[in-house]
Structure formats: structure tokens, C-alpha cells
């Protein structure tokens, strides 16, 4: 009986990516709790207020931080990339919730996928661009 009630609740889905992180985000009507990979958001993001603020930023900009629970499955990368990928996923889910949300989120920059990623190492070099020391003689 409870499963039927839970499946009837409106769920909004968004996917976010940043560096090598991928976050699959679900917004469910609730009290504003953040759950990442089955853990509380505070615990998963190591109680770092910056990461928590980044992840919840799109909801706060629209004044909906206490209206929806954020359920996230994330993998790859580190905490910074995961927090940014969660932010993009939440913003995309909010656009699905109401197309009117798109413009304010776009102005804030929450719908922009950050294309910066680690550049591959090239052969003959020590890193992506660092060359071995050059000796003229």
C-alpha cells in the first residue's frame, strides 16, 4: 500500500555531469532533505558548508529549499565535481517541474554544463603540457 502512495508522488528527474562525475537527481515533494547514495547530504559531503550550498543553490534561488527532498545517485570524480554535478541535475529537474523556472536558473548560470575537464597526457611529455627540460647543448 505504501509503495503505491510513494509511486504516485510527483518525481522530477535531472542528470548532471561535471569533470568525471555523474549525478542522477530526483526531486520529490518533501521537507528539503538531501540524500546522496543513501546517506544524508551533510555526511556524504563531509559537513562542508560550501559543497552543501553548491548542491542546494538552484532550490534556494527559487525559494523552494523546504518544499522538495533531493535524492541523488552519484558516481565518479571527487566531492567538488559531484557537488557541481548535483547542482546541474537539480536545476534540470526544476525545469522539468515548471518550465517557468528555466529563465531565472539560466540567468544564475545553473543550467550551464561546465565543459572543463582534465586534459589527457601526451606521449613525449611529462603531463598534458609539461615538457621535459630542454638543453641546448
Swiss-Prot record:
The gene is rpsI. This is Small ribosomal subunit protein uS9. Residues 105-137 are annotated as: Disordered. It comes from Cyanothece sp. (strain PCC 7425 / ATCC 29141). Belongs to the universal ribosomal protein uS9 family. Residues 105-117 have a biased composition (Basic and acidic residues). GO terms for molecular function: RNA binding; structural constituent of ribosome. It comes from the Bacteria. One of its GO terms (cellular component) is cytosolic small ribosomal subunit. Residues 118-137 have a biased composition (Basic residues).
Amino acid at each position: 500500500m505504501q509503495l503505491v502512495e510513494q509511486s504516485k508522488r510527483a518525481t522530477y528527474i535531472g542528470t548532471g555531469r561535471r569533470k568525471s562525475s555523474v549525478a542522477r537527481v530526483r526531486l520529490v515533494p518533501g521537507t528539503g532533505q538531501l540524500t546522496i547514495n543513501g546517506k544524508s547530504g551533510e555526511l556524504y559531503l563531509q559537513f562542508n558548508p560550501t559543497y552543501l550550498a553548491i548542491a542546494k543553490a538552484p532550490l534556494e534561488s527559487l525559494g523552494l529549499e523546504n518544499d522538495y527532498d533531493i535524492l541523488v545517485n552519484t558516481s565518479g570524480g571527487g566531492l567538488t565535481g559531484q557537488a557541481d554535478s548535483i547542482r546541474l541535475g537539480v536545476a534540470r529537474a526544476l525545469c522539468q517541474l515548471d518550465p517557468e523556472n528555466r529563465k531565472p536558473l539560466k540567468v544564475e548560470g545553473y543550467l550551464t554544463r561546465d565543459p572543463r575537464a582534465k586534459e589527457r597526457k601526451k606521449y613525449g611529455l611529462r603531463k598534458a603540457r609539461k615538457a621535459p627540460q630542454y638543453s641546448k647543448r
